[in-house]
A protein has these predicted regions:
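Conserved acidic carboxylate
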Residues: 15
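Non-catalytic signal-transmission and effector/linker regions of two-component phosphorelay proteins
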Residues: 1-12, 115-130
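Active-site residues of response regulator receiver
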Residues: 59
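Acidic, metal-coordinating helix/loop segments flanking the phosphotransfer/catalytic sites
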Residues: 37-55
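The feature encodes the CheY-like receiver
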Residues: 63, 81
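Two-component/phosphorelay signaling modules centered on CheY-like receiver
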Residues: 18-36
Length: 130
């Protein structure tokens, strides 16, 4: 579980399924994370520049974009390349996600266990790659 601290970490969650987005948001807020949720990618870059997240949780299959292309966009921009990204997907598995040269910091297949999500987030925020 995430440790309580006085330094709140900002997490941007981009997930098109409203129920999943709401659950992730509530769980992370209960663990003292500051969470911004988007259900499409259109506002991603402006939101990143505004909120400066410590982590982006990014669904691969969005109605308006492919999360892998968004990852490539983030990694290609010097102002966002340093931001850790956790990819999530119901369709893909860790073995069949094509990362190419732009690798995420982690991947979780949906449905995922809440403790696995929190452990993965905590690990990524402490510098680990999965």
């Amino acid at each position: 579980m995430a440790k309580s601290t006085t330094v709140y970490k900002n997490i941007l969650v981009i997930e098109d399924n409203h129920a999943i987005l709401d659950v992730i948001t509530l769980i992370l807020q209960s663990e003292a994370y500051k969470v911004t949720g988007l259900n499409k990618s259109a506002d991603m870059l402006s939101n990143i520049r505004e909120s400066e997240p410590h982590l982006v949780i990014l669904d691969i299959m969005l109605p308006d974009a492919d999360g892998r292309e968004l990852l490539k966009q983030l990694r290609s921009d010097p102002t966002t390349a340093h931001i850790p990204v956790l990819l999530i997907s119901a369709r893909y598995t860790e073995e069949n996600v094509e990362h190419g040269e732009f690798k995420p910091n982690g991947f979780l297949a949906k449905p995922f266990d809440i403790d696995d999500l929190l452990d993965r987030i905590e690990g990524i925020l402490s510098g680990k790659t999965y």
